[in-house]
From Swiss-Prot:
Record's comment on post-translational modification: The N-terminus is blocked.
GO cellular component: mitochondrion
UniProt-annotated binding residues for ATP: E163, E232, Y233, Q234, V235, G236, P237, N284, F285, S286, R348, R353
Binding-site residues for ADP, renumbered to this chain: Y365, F366, E367
Binding site for Mn(2+) 2: E165, E225, E232
Cofactor(s) recorded in Swiss-Prot or TrEMBL: Mg(2+); Mn(2+)
Chain positions recorded as Mn(2+) 1 binding sites: E163, H282, E367
Residue span, GS catalytic domain: 142-403
Organism, scientific name: Squalus acanthias
Keyword Ubl conjugation: no
Designated name of the protein: Glutamine synthetase, mitochondrial
């Protein structure tokens, strides 16, 4: 390990004394994409040209990884006022891990529409479901089943809020602002930190925040997280299927903002091994009954149901069936142990946290702290509804309708 021109600190790491080097911002030149060096002023000249009534609609979908998003744009003759006015489209699924080359056409079915913060009005962002050649949902299309489940319990008025954590990286995978071949100072000053030595990449955070508000995303806040170059934003409250729609588009916008700045936003639940916090997507959940007076009883009933179905939720809470979360849910760094279920008031080391204010008011919501940063919000919200409201039990979800 190369020693930076600064101070050597000894910090305690998992019971062992491990040397950690204080960051030196001049040690390492961050690797950025070549596209970030292109002139944005030149581009602006073209983006200000009139569109003569035409509209650019960017169709966005989740690819076969269940984590990455893809997009392409088509021209519309008029500004669409609703999803019903948007045409279906298609794409080559063999290039997105979603089909074989011999039968590669797949359908894009518009499902949610937002304002486009990059091209601006009247242009649109269009979130799409993916259907296979036989018009059955693609394996990565978890929205389809989520919408069915949400429609079954609409009279419960389920609200969700998801806390999306992410880590900023250079194009070489090195954490943004970290010195080369060593570490920044130990965790402590970065959470909600202010200052050049504590907040790494705030320009990206602010740009993303404003872009989401412009698009119509229910983005309710943001903050720097515990690890240097790690951030969080919160989406919600959203009712039913809207939670997944808004979180996926917020992720797309974050990737596009980072693309402009030439760096990467990673949703890996444990991007840096060792004595560093991982990244999650803590999910807040409530129903009308929970929010009304005396709602704590319904919260406690739901937690009891969740405790009996822990492994089912662990599999639903990351795209690799729990393997990603196994790196993050260690029982350390404000996480629960992946193999154990726990709950408590104001306990950030539990599977389920009841906020202190909820315990005092005897109503409100609870926070499921198990979903990973790269979770599919459709899978997470569907699993919560199945267990808490449809009273499902066992290791597999019930199939209510095959159509």
């Amino acid at each position: 390990m190369r020693i930076c021109r600064s101070f050597l600190f000894l910090v305690k790491k998992c019971g062992n004394i491990t040397p950690t080097i204080w960051r030196n911002q001049h040690t390492y030149k961050m690797a950025t994409s070549a596209s970030a060096n292109l002139s944005k002023i030149v581009k602006k000249n073209y983006m200000e040209l009139p569109q003569d009534g035409k509209v650019q609609a960017m169709y966005i979908w989740i690819d076969g990884t269940g984590e990455a998003v893809r997009c392409k744009t088509r021209t519309l003759d008029n500004e669409p006022k609703s999803i019903a006015e948007l045409p279906e489209w298609n794409f080559d699924g063999s290039s997105t891990y979603q089909s074989e080359g011999s039968n590669s056409d797949m359908y894009l079915v518009p499902s949610a529409m937002f304002r486009d913060p990059f091209r601006r009005d009247p242009n649109k962002l269009v979130l799409c479901e993916v259907l296979k050649y036989n018009r059955k949902p693609a394996e990565s299309n978890l929205r389809h089943s989520c919408q069915k489940i949400m429609s079954m319990i609409a009279n419960e008025y389920p609200w969700f809020g998801m806390e999306q954590e992410y880590t900023l990286l250079g194009t070489d995978g090195h954490p943004f602002g970290w010195p080369s071949n060593c570490f920044p100072g130990p965790q402590g000053p970065y959470y909600c930190g202010v200052g050049a030595d504590k907040a790494y990449g705030r320009d990206i955070v602010e740009a993303h925040y404003r872009a989401c508000l412009y698009a119509g995303i229910e983005l309710s806040g943001t903050n720097a997280e515990v690890m240097a170059a790690q951030w969080e934003y919160q989406v919600g409250p959203c009712e039913g299927i809207q939670m997944g729609d808004h979180l996926w588009i917020s992720r797309f916008i974050l990737h596009r903002v980072c693309e402009d700045f030439g760096i990467i936003a990673s949703f890996d639940p444990k991007p840096i091994p060792g004595n560093w916090n991982g990244a999650g997507c803590h999910t807040n959940f409530s129903t009308k009954a929970m929010r009304d007076d005396g709602g704590l009883k319904y919260i406690e009933d739901s937690i009891e149901k969740l405790g009996k179905r822990h492994q089912y939720h662990i599999r639903a809470y990351d795209p690799k069936g729990g393997l990603d979360n196994a790196r993050a849910l260690t029982g350390h760094h404000e996480t629960s142990n992946i193999n154990e279920f726990s709950a408590g008031v104001a306990n950030r080391g539990a599977s389920i946290r009841i906020p202190r204010s909820v315990g005092q008011d005897k109503k409100g919501y609870f926070e499921d702290r198990r979903p990973s940063a790269n979770c599919d919000p459709y899978a997470v919200t569907e699993a919560l509804v199945r267990t808490c409201l449809l009273d499902e039990s066992g290791d597999k979800p019930i199939e209510y309708n095959k159509n």
